[in-house]
Amino acid sequence: MSSVANRRTPALIVLSTGFVVLWLIIAAFPFLWTLWGSFKVQGDFFSRADWMNAIWGTRTVVETGGMFTGAGYEGAWIENQFWRAALNTLVIVFFTVIVSLTFGTLGGYALARSGYRYAFWLLMLALVFRAMPHITLVSGYLLPFFEWKLWGYKTTTVIVLVAINQPFTLWMLHSFFLNIPKDLDESAMVDGCTRFQAFRHVIIPVMWPGVVTTGLFSFLLAYNDFAVTAMLLSQENQTMVPQIAGFLGSTFEEGNVMFAVAAVVSATAPLFVLIVFFQRQIVSGLTAGAVKG
């Protein structure tokens, strides 16, 4: 009976496969189109006369002699030193993730193992702060940062990003710790471990997929941030996202859209690599956080 119920008809297979393929095309098309257009000139990629120019590169052939050109990448990475923004982003993201996970694992473990009612209300308070718009929180830091001459530095930006991200890491890691039986802690301490040693050598290895998943979400928050980095960083310490916005120009300054297109592709590609590399940990981590063990 079960084999009959699990047997899929050819029509169902075709329908499900077609749906998955359609979804993949819709999801991947914006990035693939931007990737293709990043090797064209602006007259082709943003052509109003014929959108097919973006495919055949009519203006690109006229201006550069070939269907493809790397002028956008050269202008962004070399002429405008986008590599400096990439390094700044790497530094800020790295320390934001490390600090967030350090405090998040310790705090989430303490709240999960605490039997007091205040743990719930602390998590609710953290959720309130997490729900607030980032721009609301950042504006409160501007005056003291200017007064204490701390504005423009990467260190202060890391502190603000950690403060904004910490409620999320607390909630997520707290749910992972709740799924780990307290018997593991007690068994480790019976064997001679202190509470911290049990946490470090027993609990963390068990819930490592959850730590990786939370770290990736923290990474994405800091990597994609615009409001905090645009308002708190000086020009020389600027990260990728605000600099991409700068490539688009302003009311008083003309930008170069193709520099922005090339920079967008450069900033997006590492995210695909990261997700593919950690996909197994992400799936197992999300599953562990969703199911009460």
Segments and roles (model prediction):
Residues 4-7, 12-293:
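A structural signal for multi-pass alpha-helical bundles of membrane permease subunits
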